[in-house]
Amino acid sequence: MRIAFVTQWFPPEPGTFVAAAIADGLAERGHEVHVLTGFPNYPTGRLQAGYPLRPYRREIRSDNVTVHRAPLFPSHNGSAIKRMANYLSFGVSASWIARTKMPIPDVWLTYSSPATAALPALTVPRRLRAPSYLLLQDLWPDSVTESGFVHGKLGRGIDAALHRFCDWTYRRSAGIGIISPSMADLLVERGVEPAKIHLLPNWVEDTHLSPYQAPTDALRRSLGLPEGRLFMYAGNIGELQGLEPLIEAFAKCPETSLVLVGEGIARASLQHLVTSRDILNVHFLPSQPIDRIGLFIAAADVQIVSLRDTRLLRATMPSKLQSCMAASRPVLASAAGDVADLITASESGIAVPPGDVPAAIDAIRRLRDTPTDTLLEMGRRARAHYELNFAPDVGVDRLESLLERATATRRNC
């Protein structure tokens, strides 16, 4: 198949390993993949060095993967107007690139967050049309309104417009892949046919990780990390992650250390909290390139996944959880819903209710006192669950089958 894969974010941006795994995994099966993406500016909102903004840029990633970059308004701050300008500018310019620079595909695959990434597949001229398959990472506009970016009269207007747009994209799509089970219920409530919905969890490559490697003080020293029982959060530091209660909990557990690796709009306020409270066991590090992040994950005893408690976030599965499990690390999850259910069912960590500081303190102390061998066994159970459900071969098999089914039907073209 010739696959047009639309994703606003793609390497070299940090945190784009899922999109990269999709493109590379399909290409390794012999499919011709054309990635339509933006110029790298995530998560800082500043263009990366070597990527000056221009009308179009073409790159060859591998024999079967061609990257087409569309210009956009670079921004990733707390301004709702600037953030929407970022999303819309990519959707519009990517639609132009799809019309003028890309070959006719057999199927469009859209990595949907933001929802505006669906524009190219659904607005191309008839001669370029092909079945469109949506891979939903989160549900819009719920994720926008719950993040607190929009409110008041403007927020209500944006919410209504995005609802209409998203419902239109769902109707026009040949199929919709969801990353967590509870997403299906929310989509059915929105009027999506259940037959269109397929559970398609994200998968992650593990070539940059070091599964089964026990953390050592020597490795921590080489990375500038604190010694002793070490907890780590590696990923986007945003409002939806709800990390403040965890920092409050670690402040009560000074014999442990928490390292937060990443960037995001909530980082500055969390750093201010740590500084103003003189919390000495919480540390911040910048985002790390993919060839180094595996070392940091391997250096920690426990990885952290954190999400605020909302109806939407109870129905999501952040891809960082798959990375933690692939690295065979036990997980402390401050999350509800599907994430908590997975941690409990796989016996790979401890889940506590989001925002519950006493429960988090208790979990931190339990993991602090857990023997290293027991933590490693929890990590092995995490790895086993990854290999069964989130390994690349498993994910590519599922996606390839669904895309072939969509191509065969030629629906909604």
Describe each model-derived feature in a short phrase.
Residues Y51-R57, S210-G224:
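A short helix/loop element that forms part of the nucleotide-sugar donor recognition site in Leloir-type
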Residues R99, T116-L119, T123-R127, R156-I178:
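Membrane-proximal helix-turn-helix segments that form the acceptor-binding/catalytic region
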Residues G228, R366, D373-N389:
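A short, well-ordered alpha-helix in the C-terminal region of glycosyltransferases
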